[in-house]
């Protein structure tokens, strides 16, 4: 599996803060990989603690299920966020053999695909822990060298491959770092989680 898919993430707190309210989650399973990006409302330590707690809820859930789905994972996050300040998130699952899967989300965590076909996926408004209307997962069929990005609203969505010519060539951790460093906004927590299908 790891020979076909690689993953990476990078999280940077906003200016003046030492901890971020964004958190990335990557978990390789026997047949694929689940990747998630969580953006808690607010900044600083309290937001960071909640973001970590939410990703830990995903980790615990994955120990109990055989076939995870992004929609079920988002429901886990929604329940874990009840009684808190709330968060937005996106979750994707990719099968390691077929490179097919799906992605879903709530709120303004973005999803973009680069490589064989450029695609931008936006999600309905909402807030985990408060209001989360039913979601229809978006199907994905990736190809070798395709790159799937999940990124928070602390990263500008107004960039394209011409501004990052080696986007589909770099290792996943390098891509995540470069997306945040090049296109991140200093006034907000910025984060990016990456799945890259190797050529």
Report residues per predicted region.
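Short Pro/Gly-enriched beta-strand edge/turn motifs at strand-loop
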Residues: 4-10, 72-75, 174-177
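Acidic loop->beta-strand submotif enriched in PP2C/PPM serine/threonine phosphatases
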Residues: 17-33, 86-89, 120-160
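Small-residue (GG/TT-enriched) beta-loop-alpha framework at ligand/catalytic clefts
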Residues: 118-130, 170-172, 181-184
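Sensory/regulatory domains in signal-transduction proteins
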Residues: 13, 32, 100, 117-124, ...
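Active-site metal-binding loops of divalent metal-dependent hydrolases
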Residues: 39-41, 109, 153-154
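C-terminal catalytic subdomain
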Residues: 77-78, 144, 149-199
